[in-house]
Design a protein with these regions (language model features):
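Long, ordered, helix-rich scaffold segments
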Residues: 1-82, 107, 138, 214-217
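Extended, hydrophobic alpha-helical segments in both membrane/secreted and soluble proteins
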Residues: 3, 83, 87-90, 100, ...
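C-terminal capping alpha-helices of c-type cytochrome domains
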Residues: 32-65, 141-153, 161-164, 180-181, ...
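Short glycine-rich, low-complexity segments
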Residues: 117-125, 129-135, 139, 191, ...
Length: 217
């Protein structure tokens, strides 16, 4: 416990970069189930909470489906096509994709628990800088997104679809949400084979070519 608190204190003092402690490591630290450790994690790393039992059951179901043999015979090219439709707008992988969410290339993608936990329950771990805020504007609009930059005059908000620069005089109320900008249920609409293809692509060590249907776009 003491060594964990020393590590978190070093992150707090900027002696250790926050990004050096991945979501995988944070999940391991949460396993201490120590109130002091969890409180310090929430302070210096970001929002963390336990995964609900219903979602844990979903994760176990996917793990039963995604056997080593099934993944070995999955189609990673089709998996990339699914990734481009569902993930690439927000995440980068192998140098391709968006920058709204964390870059996936260096994450612990070969760990099935890590991969599924982040897809099934994205709000369990939200690193600093990726917390979602809810912004109510005087014209009645309510926006959700990540704060990219803020000054006394302006707030730059990255939503799921666009980067918006708001005049702070337009903002009536702003609050932090405990939900991730990444939507839940990413796997719910996919068939078992599509899930296997997507996971095989995400957990792979190298890039694969785009399907011809996407290369021309």
């Amino acid at each position: 416990k003491e060594s964990v608190l020393l590590l978190l204190a070093a992150i707090d003092k900027k002696q250790v970069p926050q990004e050096d402690v991945s979501a995988f490591h944070v999940r391991q630290l949460r396993n201490f189930k120590d109130k002091a450790v969890v409180a310090k994690l929430n302070q210096v790393w970001g929002l963390t909470r336990e995964t609900p039992e219903k979602k844990r059951a979903q994760i176990e179901g996917y793990k039963t489906l995604l056997t080593a043999e099934r993944l070995q015979h999955a189609d990673r090219v089709k998996g990339r096509a699914l990734y481009e439709k569902t993930c690439a707008k927000c995440h980068r992988l192998f140098g391709s994709g968006g920058n709204i969410g964390p870059d996936l290339t260096g994450s612990n993608r070969t760990n099935m628990d890590y991969l599924l936990e982040n897809m099934v329950d994205p709000s369990a771990l939200i690193p600093k800088g990726y917390e979602m805020v809810v912004v109510a504007l005087e014209d009645g609009r309510v926006l959700n997104g990540n704060v990219v930059r803020k000054t006394d005059q302006q707030l730059t908000l990255q939503t799921q679809t666009e980067l918006m620069v708001l005049d702070r005089r337009q903002i009536e109320e702003m609050s932090q949400s405990n939900l991730s900008l990444m939507p839940e249920g990413q796997l719910d609409k996919l068939s078992e084979q599509e899930i296997a293809d997507l996971i095989a692509y995400l957990s792979g060590h190298s890039q694969v070519k785009l399907p011809e249907s996407l290369e021309s776009k």
